[in-house]
Amino acid sequence: MEVRYSQDSESGMLLKNGLKEGKEGKDSQGSISKTFLKDQQESFSPSGAVENCEKSRASSGDPDYCRRILVRDAKGSIREIILPKGLDLDRPKRTRTSFTAEQLYRLEMEFQRCQYVVGRERTELARQLNLSETQVKVWFQNRRTKQKKDQGKDSELRSVVSETAATCSVLRLLEQGRLLTPPGLPGLLPHCGSSSLGSALRGPSLGITANGGSSSSSRSSAGSSGTAGGSPPLPTVTSSGTVTGLQGSPPAHGLFSFPMPSLLGSVASRISSTPLGMAGSLAGNLQELSARYLCSSAFEPYSRTNGKEALDKKVLE
């Protein structure tokens, strides 16, 4: 049997087969490249990141209010960050409202008139100032908060200033000798009688002698008041600044931790030239001294300190 075939037909078949194979190879290569690009795009796209994060969250057991996102840092590496779902990253940041000088002046005037502007007044004010009602409402809220802070600072400053003024007045009177109770006024301190402050104020009552002499009337009145009240004999200050009659009292310090001999000596040296008018001037000055200076908050730190020291002594004993 004789078989004949044409060379043209064979070459045509080979060409067709080659084209078919090339087309199939091209299609397979294109499908591979498309698949690779799709995988890469999904791995780096936000939706793919969210899906991957949801899958990883479901597998890792993260709470519902958290979400994971993939970010690329400056070095090119990819990191995973956990953020709350309520955080809207796509929303632009709100710009801060800037008011003009005219708007601020008008708002301040309205605030001085009424601190709460609501309803039709707020609508009209916002329309006149070319602002929204929300901006006006927020401004008034911030202004009320600022006023409360300023009032708190002012009240604290006033209390500090009043305490400082009271302390300075007491120290000034103490320096002038007005807090040293004369024998003729034993009942000046009725409110502080049982406290250590009252005993400290009543303790340094004095009879004054100048140029080495002695006043028998002052000593006799001091002795009578001392025996009547059951208190120890009253101290006596000489012109040289020495104090007698303080055997029962602590020798080191007196009121406000001032050395009592030096304090009384300075007072005695100031009034040594006019010894006869001392009792009258002291009585007048003490009557001018009101009870708020003697029992004010300026004495509280010292009374608390004395009470604490006494308690510590009892504990040590």
UniProtKB/Swiss-Prot annotation:
Q: Where is the composition biased (Basic and acidic residues)?
A: 18-27
Its tissue distribution reads: Expressed in the anterior neural keel and later in the preoptic area and optic stalk.
Tell where it localizes.
Answer: Nucleus
Identify the domain of life: Eukaryota
State the DNA-binding region(s).
Answer: 92-151
Compositional bias annotation for Low complexity: 212-225
What are this entry's molecular-function GO terms? DNA-binding transcription factor activity, RNA polymerase II-specific; RNA polymerase II cis-regulatory region sequence-specific DNA binding
Keyword Methyltransferase on this protein?
no
Task: Locate the region Disordered.
Answer: 1-62, 203-248
Q: Which of UniProt's keywords are assigned here?
A: Developmental protein, DNA-binding, Homeobox, Nucleus, Transcription, Transcription regulation
Asked if the record carries the keyword Transcription, the reply is: yes
Q: Name one GO biological process term.
A: regulation of transcription by RNA polymerase II
Q: Cellular component GO terms, alphabetically?
A: nucleus
Cite the record's Polar residues compositional bias ranges.
236-247
Q: Return the CDD domains for the record.
A: homeodomain (cd00086)
Q: Identify the InterPro entries for this entry.
A: EMX-VAX-Noto_Homeobox_TFs, HD, Homeobox_CS, Homeodomain-like_sf, HTH_motif
Q: Which family does it belong to?
A: Belongs to the EMX homeobox family.
Q: Explain the purpose of this protein.
A: Transcription factor that is required for closure of the choroid fissure and together with Vax2 is required for optic nerve differentiation and to limit retinal development to the optic cup.
Q: Report the protein name in the record.
A: Ventral anterior homeobox 1
Q: Which organism is it from?
A: Danio rerio
**Species lineage:** Eukaryota, Metazoa, Chordata, Craniata, Vertebrata
